[in-house]
Amino acid sequence: LVIAVVIALGSMLSTAYYHPITKFVSNYSTKLIIAGFVVPLGISVLINRINLTINKMAFFTYSVLTGLLLSYAVFKYGIGITLFSCIFAAGIFAIMALFGYYTKEDLERYRLILKINMFFLICLFSINLYFGIPILYWIIAYSALINFTSLIGFDINHIKKELILMSKNEIFLDRVSLMGTMQFYLDYFVLSLALMSIFGKTFT
């Protein structure tokens, strides 16, 4: 995860200081945003069907994409809003991670509704990128904030159980660890975007 974050930051900085990449991100921002949601979902579906090394390479490639999207967020909202949103999201992530790890409640019963909401929000967000309906913008932003905050707790709890259950299966353990990292990465990324969407419109 640390390597992925370093790659993402490197990608963001290279975009900020290298004009051709800056132009590319500006021209293809909508497609990059959609790809930012589709790629991790695709990896999660294929993770048990393809080689673990390929999965890791795909994850690091996704980290580059995340860096490009963060650079776009800086262009759109400014460094202050972007940084504040990322720090705020990190605080929420830490709290929900602790809750998900230590809670005795069975969170599996929320799995279906959270996953359905996630796919629905991603589809709705992708559509609204083209239509730009203001009321839909706010519905998506606040719904994403609530849903992905909840998903952090659920995913931590779910991965913890999977790791305990498969602790003696090294191959499966590696795949579960990678899947968990990817899911946490996506949860944090979308949570940060939701906060940027809210703070960006509120304070600018």
Predicted regions and their residues:
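A hydrophobic alpha-helical transmembrane-helix feature that marks the membrane cores
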Residues: 1-204
